[in-house]
Amino acid sequence: MIPEPTPDAGNLADAAWNRRPRRTPVYDHDVSLSVIEAITGTELAGLRTGDRSDREEFFRRYTRFFRDYGYDTVTFEALISSVLPGNGALYFDRPGSLKSRADFEAYPWQELADRFFERYSVDFELLAEHMPPGMKAVGGPGNGVFECVQDIVGYDELCYIRADDPDL
């Protein structure tokens, strides 16, 4: 008989601080929704983009997967690049939208935090509401600075800008 899961996010925190955890934590930086669907036999992807009740069900199922499969934490990221105007160079092979200093100066940098929270606040609230006891979330805003820059500039264009305007 498999024992009832007893997640403890402290195990991952201890390992991260190079302290011996009570037990070795189970962690994955990301688990594909299609993989979770295949393992559990339940739908997730369609719920993720639905209305609020769909999204509640998504987070209930999503967090339950991590608990039931022995994880101490729930991995969740909301991609910053998804709220960037003119995005798509990194993930969708579109031309970058920033090609010059003028484009850079005209870009709505000050709006980005509001756009991110507008899009994802409810998701983080629902994640917190459905977090199993003993677990914590790992992740948050996904994408680093370089990924975000690549997504609105494009890698090739970034190389040209570096040569043409190194101070940018």
Task: State where each predicted segment sits.
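Catalytic cores of TIM-barrel enzymes
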Residues: 1-168
